[in-house]
Amino acid sequence: MNTTSDTLRVGFIGLGSQGGPMARRIIEAGYPVTLWARRPGTLEPFADTAAKSAGSPAELAAASDLICVCVRDDADTEEVVDAVLGGLAAGGVIAVHSTVHPDTCRRLAERAQARGVRLIDAPVSGGAPAAEAGRLLVMAGGDEETVEFCRPVFASYGDPIVYLGPVGAGQIAKLLNNAAFTAHLGVAVSLLALGRSLGVDQLRLADVISHGSGNSFALERVASAGGTLARIGEHAGHLLRKDVRLIADLAATAPAGAEGGASEPGDAGHGHGEHGATLLAAADAALALMNVGR
């Protein structure tokens, strides 16, 4: 087992639109990389690289010191982590880049610890273009020394890399980010529709707002999609719904009057406990516009 980050052997599972560019950046940074995918065709884009392929997650684990997992949801994450724990040597590290419930990461971290393996959560934000440019936001939770151990690998595709606290803290930050993005999508659609009804050209209004204090990443996405959420909902609605459901579940368990947190007026009447009602109401409105209500 290598113990210094500059000699790390990296395994990567989850080579989709987000994970694929991340894996390529690690390879281009010079790390020895092993890949695994359920479908052999997923590995074809890496034929021009020095990456090796494994026949199973356990085989990948046996050839790795750090394993990055970037799969779709909680069930896939649990399945992959359980599989790699069968081959990863004590002292190895698993970084969960998937966006999942914090409790999923906490549970998996306990299983890993029982085998002498360290697990951190490190969800990312920014999409494929940011990954390709090495500008993904990485939100890390877990043992801080372990996060620092992984930082040079994360830096091949991420900047900034933010340490947030214990295992699960990264997921909480990512889910809040995604809930805010969902809410902003709905606000952007409403803003552009109101502007049209008042006689202002939609594209010119979007250009103005993009240079003002009301700008948001969501506004850019909505404007480029013609001022509606139809296309965004078709491609990402189910994932946004998943994340809003997860943060709503967390909000329902947030202790009343948590230290440092101010209650929102009328929260209790929104069914979201004392915290997060305004955020979740706006996110729910956006999901409804995408026809994927929570």
Cite the ranges covered by each PLM segment.
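NAD(P)+-binding Rossmann beta1-loop-alpha1 motif at the extreme N-terminus of oxidoreductases
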Residues: 1-69
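Rossmann-fold dinucleotide-binding core
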Residues: 10, 99-176
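Hydrophobic beta-strand scaffold residues
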Residues: 33, 53, 118-120, 161, ...
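Helical "substrate-binding/catalytic lid" subdomain
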Residues: 169-294
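Hydrophobic residues within alpha-helices
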Residues: 22-26, 108, 194
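Rossmann-fold NAD(P) dinucleotide-binding segment
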Residues: 57-118
